[in-house]
């Protein structure tokens, strides 16, 4: 939403709209920064694979939000070239994150499916009262040898998320 509002902020920065755009930009940047840190800390303590990915996504979207706030602040303070670079970096991160995280979510679905399959073959057929959670990462050791394609997809998605191809 903030990215779609950039043309509006461009108009307001030229005196045709709301005063105090710099304050709005700072609020956007700080909101994003605080949210990014909080969501990352929440993701860090999760055991459910999908919750880790979801909170990580929240953290990264907040990081992108911070970049957009900084871009608006730079634009408002007549650093137009730096503002364009910050905006472009935010949009690049958004696209890269969407593609890589989509791959990670699909691979996690494959892992969860395999965990259900493996558990049902090991457990007794009539034992439906156990507390097995196929999404709990504490139960997922040694899956790379059983799911080499999924492990490769996870490795590629993880490398893309951290920017490894660009380093």
Residue ranges of model-derived segments:
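Hydrophobic transmembrane alpha-helices and their helix-loop junctions in integral membrane proteins
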Residues: 1-167
């Amino acid at each position: 939403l903030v990215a779609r509002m950039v043309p509006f902020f461009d108009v307001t920065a030229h005196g045709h709209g709301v005063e105090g755009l710099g304050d709005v930009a700072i609020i956007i940047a700080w909101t994003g920064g605080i949210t990014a840190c909080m969501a990352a800390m929440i993701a860090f303590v999760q055991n459910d694979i999908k919750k880790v990915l979801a909170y990580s996504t929240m953290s990264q979207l907040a990081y992108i939000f911070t970049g957009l706030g900084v871009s608006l602040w730079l634009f408002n303070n007549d650093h137009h070239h730096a503002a364009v670079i910050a905006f472009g970096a935010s949009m690049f991160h958004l696209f890269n994150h969407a593609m890589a995280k989509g791959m990670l979510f699909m691979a996690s679905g494959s892992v969860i499916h395999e965990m259900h399959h493996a558990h049902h073959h090991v457990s007794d057929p009539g034992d439906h009262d156990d507390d097995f959670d196929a999404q709990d990462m504490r139960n997922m050791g040694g899956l790379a040898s059983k799911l080499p394609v999924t492990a490769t997809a996870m490795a590629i998605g993880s490398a893309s998320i951290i920017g490894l191809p660009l380093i």
